[in-house]
Regions:
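Mixed-charge (Asp/Glu-Lys/Arg
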Residues: 1-37, 42-159
Length: 159
């Protein structure tokens, strides 16, 4: 059986790349402690006291289209295709690609029984999620909008 490529450094790098993209898009975000179940990053909107849990699924190989996932305790899954080439040298490295996908979309995809692997080619109009960091911003804003009436009711004021 061929030895599995150790991609732990690239995996950590993928999380930091996603973190950087969030910050560059003016979304406050933080890396969690190692091995938090279900998510790797927390995006926040401090002034609204809201947060979004983000699981980063990085793939090292150029041309990868899927990843294993079994824990859906997050709000978004960011597929970070690092595109570092191929183990056998048959593929060239190219720029990483990122897909910001709501967890319910990923959860609805068929998964293979052995590895719980999803294939993003199954997502209709996958390009709508490519580099779509605005989805996280909108999520953080909408949580706040939805919680306002509840906060007013709790204080005895409606409207």
């Amino acid at each position: 059986m061929p030895k599995r490529l150790d991609t732990r450094l690239e995996s950590e790098g993928g999380e930091f790349l996603v973190l950087g993209h969030l910050l560059l898009n003016r979304i406050a975000a933080y890396k969690t402690y190692t091995n938090m179940p279900g998510y790797d990053l927390i995006a926040t909107k401090p002034e609204a006291n809201t947060s979004a849990r983000i699981q980063v699924k990085s793939r090292w190989r150029t041309g990868a289209t899927g990843f294993p996932i079994s824990n859906f305790d997050c709000d978004f899954v960011v597929a970070a295709f690092l595109n570092r080439g191929a183990k056998d040298g048959s593929k060239q490295a190219k720029a990483p690609e990122f897909f910001v996908i709501p967890v319910d979309v990923v959860k609805s995809l068929p998964r293979d029984a052995r590895w719980s692997k999803v294939d993003l080619r199954q997502v209709s109009d996958l390009n709508q999620y490519k580099e779509n960091w605005q989805l996280v911003s909108d999520f953080l804003a909408n949580i706040h909008a939805q919680s306002k009436p509840a906060q007013r009711i709790a204080r005895g004021r409606v409207g």
